[in-house]
Swiss-Prot record:
Pfam families: Ribosomal_L32e. Belongs to the eukaryotic ribosomal protein eL32 family. Transmembrane segments: none annotated. GO terms for biological process: translation. Component of the large ribosomal subunit. The ribosome is a large ribonucleoprotein complex responsible for the synthesis of proteins in the cell. InterPro entries: Ribosomal_eL32 (IPR001515), Ribosomal_eL32_CS (IPR018263), Ribosomal_eL32_sf (IPR036351). Its main location: cytoplasm. One of its GO terms (cellular component) is cytosolic large ribosomal subunit. This is Large ribosomal subunit protein eL32. One of its GO terms (molecular function) is structural constituent of ribosome. The modification N6-succinyllysine is found at K50. It is found in: Cytoplasm. The modification Phosphoserine is found at S62.
């Protein structure tokens, strides 16, 4: 079976790939880098002074058509069982399956076999599969 291709593959443009960091997180170890909105009355980041770190806002968002799209052109759908693959049957040209991390190796093998029959793409087909020697 040839590798599945998406129905359409638009050019994915990322407007902003840098992480927004918290104000003064570079200065103090106790302040983590995770973004928190500054709420102080005199805060220069909140007041958007020139030369300060940038605050995230709606303008940095991705294009609605390419949001959550993988570089392959598919969107992910998390699969926990073989039964959940039936949902992807009609939209296998736009969605691909991703096997959840808590699925057992036995069920994982069953999912991969069923995926081959239904012509659905999987992002992690080798998840939890060990070689024959180790078993």
């Amino acid at each position: 079976m040839a590798s599945l291709r998406p129905l359409v593959k638009p050019k994915i443009i990322k407007k902003w790939t840098k992480k927004f960091i918290r104000h003064q997180s570079d200065r103090y170890v106790k302040i983590k880098r995770n973004w928190r909105k500054p709420r102080g009355i005199d805060n220069r980041v909140r007041r958007r002074f020139k030369g300060q770190i940038l605050m995230p806002n709606i303008g940095y968002g991705s294009n609605k058509k390419t949001k959550h799209m993988l570089p392959s052109g598919f969107r992910k759908f998390l699969v926990h069982s073989v039964k959940e693959l039936e949902v992807l049957l009609m939209c296998n040209k736009s969605y691909c399956a991703k096997i959840a991390h808590n699925v057992s190796s036995k069920n994982c093998k069953a999912i991969v076999e069923r995926v081959a029959q239904l012509a659905i793409r999987v992002t992690n087909p080798n998840a939890r599969l060990r070689s024959e020697e180790n078993e």
